[in-house]
Amino acid sequence: GVSSAASDVYKRQQMCIQELSTCLQYGLPIKIININNQALGMVRQWQDMQYGGRYAASTYEESLPDFVKLTEAYGHKGFKVTQRNKLGPTLEKAFSMKDKLVFVDVYVDQSEHVYPMLVAPNGSMEDMWLAKGKKA
């Protein structure tokens, strides 16, 4: 069979975590790669770019669950990746488990941004940020 993979961010995982039960019920061998920066990434990025790094209610290091343990509590397999050189081998291992749902929790630095980013509502291409400190 074909494996399905999804990339996600941790906050959305908390809103839909109960679906791990549905996946077990139907035997869905999905691979979930969770990009975990322990923050509301786009909110924090906006606070960096528009408000000079004045953060408010955008980081959650102390209050997050252990997603690997949570995944395993639902009967699936989970891996935590905290070092870049472990990512490739961990993904290979995850995708080799053809008959299991596997959750890979990948920690990234909170200062990492996603580009390009359109910062003006209904804006044009000229309103886009191409890199940190670099507008179109």
What are these regions (language model features)?
Residues 1-6:
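Single conserved hydrophobic/aromatic residue that forms the stacking wall/gate
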Residues 9:
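Active-site loops and adjacent core secondary-structure elements that bind or stabilize anionic groups
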Residues 13-14, 38-42, 111:
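Short gly/pro/ser/thr-enriched loop/turn and capping motifs at secondary-structure boundaries
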Residues 17-20, 42-47, 114-119:
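Short acidic, glycine/serine/threonine-rich loops at helix termini
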Residues 25-38:
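A glycine-rich helix N-cap at a beta->alpha junction
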Residues 32, 78-80, 103:
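Conserved beta-strand scaffold positions in the cores of enzyme catalytic domains, especially
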Residues 48-93:
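Conserved thiamine diphosphate
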Residues 87-136:
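Glycine/aspartate-rich loop-and-adjacent alpha/beta segment that forms the canonical ThDP
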